[in-house]
Curated annotation (Swiss-Prot):
Similarity-based family: Belongs to the YscJ lipoprotein family.
Protein function: Necessary for both basic pathogenicity and the induction of the hypersensitive response in resistant plants. Could be a part of a specific transport apparatus or a secretion apparatus that is required for pathogenicity. Hrp proteins may form a complex (tunnel/pore) that enables the export of molecules such as virulence and avirulence factors.
Name by which UniProt lists this protein: Protein hrpB3
Gene Ontology biological-process entries: protein secretion; symbiont-mediated perturbation of host programmed cell death
Record bears the keyword Signal: yes
Signal peptide: 1-18
InterPro entries noted in UniProt: AMP-bd_C_sf, FliF_N_dom, T3SS_SctJ, YscJ/FliF
Gene source species: Xanthomonas euvesicatoria
Superkingdom assignment: Bacteria
Any one annotated GO CC term: cell outer membrane
Pfam families (alphabetical): YscJ_FliF
Length: 253
């Protein structure tokens, strides 16, 4: 009985793999949910699967919508860029860092956390924060001020101009010695104006009847193969055609 079962499993796997294609893998569940929501709103028959009981996730889309799906995700800044946090930057690795290395890692960690925070604002596709903390000489009379530059790419139709003062205040209070005037914010539009634009330009889905016909044909082939290789207890071997003769004799009788 193993041969028919293996054949059926193989046919089902081939049919499933032919229906969809993997877009991204190794995702967190939150990223997978965000991507799935965006794709569904854009008219894509997407799905998410996990190969390892929820540790990582993958997002799939129909073959005929792969290119369109990637365009939609790219316009929405998905999957989200992963930013390191201070805990990861200063995790114990058994090595002793120099004060200069510690300073660089701290500045980088703060900029990464700020970038992650700003990326969570509605309408933001991506955000990057660059921080400059001069290493001032304590014996010098001139002090170089700290500065920060914020770059935000946002979706067209999102009004982030009113949030610029709040963004500058957030960055100022996150960096020691930084003043409000030394924080610059650059806003750049990108992506689509709305999901309605993508929905209107979504490629038409083909009729499902060819797939249903293919599934029916595959099931018929699997049934015929199972019948052919059905075991014959009397002969002690696989007796497919002999089994057919027995069935015909039974009907005639």
């Amino acid at each position: 009985m193993r041969a028919p079962r293996c054949l059926v499993v193989l046919l089902v796997a081939l049919l499933l793999s032919a229906c969809s294609q993997q877009l991204y893998s190794g995702l967190t569940e939150n990223d997978a949910n965000d991507m799935l929501e965006v794709l569904l709103h854009a008219g894509v028959d997407a799905s998410k699967v996990t190969p390892d009981d929820g540790k990582t996730w993958a997002v799939n889309a129909p073959h005929d919508q792969v290119s369109y799906s990637l365009e939609v995700l790219r316009a929405h800044g998905l999957p989200h860029e992963r930013h390191a946090n201070l805990g990861e930057m200063f995790k114990k690795d058994g090595l002793i860092s120099t004060p200069t290395e510690e300073r660089v890692r701290f500045i980088y960690g703060v900029s990464q956390q700020l970038s992650q925070t700003l990326s969570n604002i509605d309408g933001v596709i991506s955000a990057d924060v660059e921080i400059v903390l001069p290493n001032n000489d304590p014996l010098s009379t001139s002090v170089k001020p700290s500065s920060a530059a914020v770059f935000i790419k946002f979706r067209v139709g999102s009004d982030l101009t009113s949030l610029v003062p709040n963004i500058k205040t957030l960055v100022m209070h996150s960096v020691e010695g930084l003043t409000y005037e030394n924080v610059s914010v650059t806003l750049v539009p990108g992506g689509a104006e709305s999901d309605a634009q993508f929905t209107a330009s979504a490629p038409p889905r083909p009729s499902p009847w060819p797939w249903l016909a293919g599934c029916a044909l595959a099931l018929c082939l699997a049934g015929a193969a199972a019948l052919y290789w059905w075991p014959n207890p009397q002969a002690g071997r696989w007796g497919g055609w002999q089994r057919l003769r027995e069935l015909k004799k039974g009907k005639a009788g």
